[in-house]
Amino acid sequence: MNHLDRLERKIGYCFNDIALLKQALTHRSAATQHNERLEFLGDSILNFTIAEALYHQFPRCNEGELSRMRATLVREPTLAILARQFELGDYMSLGSGELKNGGFRRESILADCVEAIIGAMSLDQGLAVTTQVIRNWYQQLLAEIKPGDNQKDAKTRLQEYLQGKHLPLPTYEVVNIQGEAHCQIFTVECKVKSAGKIDRTFVAKGSSRRKAEQAAAEQILKELDIK
């Protein structure tokens, strides 16, 4: 059994075209044929699959409640948990700089890899098989999730925390966009102010402006130990 066979057993899916899996595991720092286009595809499929599951699971919930639960299930920390369960860091191809910086442990890289694998599965055997695999991955998470305040996304939780402390709201600014139009990486700066002075600046990246802003807000929540 080779190392990719072991990974296939962990994710519960066997590829017909193993080259798709190899590409899904390849970070942009390692090769020109990397996983960002697959990540773009997988992100959309994951959002649809989880939205459909929640729609049927919670027939009495309104759009806002469903959206918050979906955001919880598809956000970066949740995907990173799945990635660690699969031990994806042991299988990824990263450039030397990312390896030295511990990229195989970074939540954003792990989360992106999960989405890329989803995209690769859809190209390999289609949507029906892929959505079933995703549902298998999320079986316990879907069973445990419930509507409520704890489902609010990171930006909302940070905003409510600052408002409760009568502090200015954070500002988000896109400071860099890399890549071609179909697979861009956004870098966002989030500044948190207190009493008119800038206290901290946090920087995060994502495959969309929304993802980068959420990742920056998540960093601040962790720093401030806000649940």
Swiss-Prot record:
Report the Pfam families cross-referenced here: dsrm, Ribonucleas_3_3
Enzyme Commission numbers on file:
3.1.26.3
| Locations listed in the record | Cytoplasm
Report the enzyme's class at the first EC level: hydrolase
Primary site of residence: cytoplasm
Q: Which UniProt keywords apply?
A: Cytoplasm, Endonuclease, Hydrolase, Magnesium, Metal-binding, mRNA processing, Nuclease, RNA-binding, rRNA processing, rRNA-binding, tRNA processing
The biological process GO terms on file are: mRNA processing; regulation of gene expression; rRNA processing; tRNA processing
**RNase III domain mapped to chain residues:** 4-126
Q: Give a GO cellular-component term.
A: cytoplasm
Report which superkingdom the organism of origin falls in. Bacteria
Q: Which HAMAP family match?
A: RNase_III
Q: How does it assemble?
A: Homodimer.
Instruction: Indicate the family of this protein.
Output: Belongs to the ribonuclease III family.
- How is this protein named in the record? Ribonuclease 3
Q: What species was this sequence derived from? A: Haemophilus influenzae (strain PittEE)
